[in-house]
Amino acid sequence: MKVTFKNVKLRKFCESKSSSKKLRVRLADLIASESVQDIVYGKPHPLKGDRLGQFAVSLEGAERLVFEPINAQIPRKEDGSIDWAKVTEVCIVFIGDYHD
């Protein structure tokens, strides 16, 4: 998949040697996947509520790597929800515990 970052600060954090090994592995998993559906590890799941339209994978404890689709045209199912199996471009928007 094509992976971008919401801002330079987030990109630099993800690419730094001080970032966790699990974060780097999850990013590598995203890049190696053809679509969101191909992600196997990290308990991948679509989000709800104020994060509707975003997807997350687990890192450490309650921390998550959160991303959203950026395909030129966001693929949708008949019910209007995002068809994550067809999402091939994502933007990393948040890393941390969104449960707070």
Where do the language-model regions lie?
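Arg/Lys-rich, positively charged N-terminal/basic patches that mediate binding to nucleic acids
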Residues: M1-A28
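Amphipathic alpha-helical interface surfaces
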Residues: K6, L23-R26, K43, L59, ...
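Short, contiguous, well-ordered secondary-structure segments
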Residues: R26-L27, A32, P75-K77
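Residues in well-ordered beta-strands of folded domains
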Residues: I31, K48, C91-V93
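A short, surface-exposed loop/turn module that caps and links secondary-structure elements
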Residues: S33-F55
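Enriched for short, Lys/Arg-rich terminal
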Residues: V57-D100
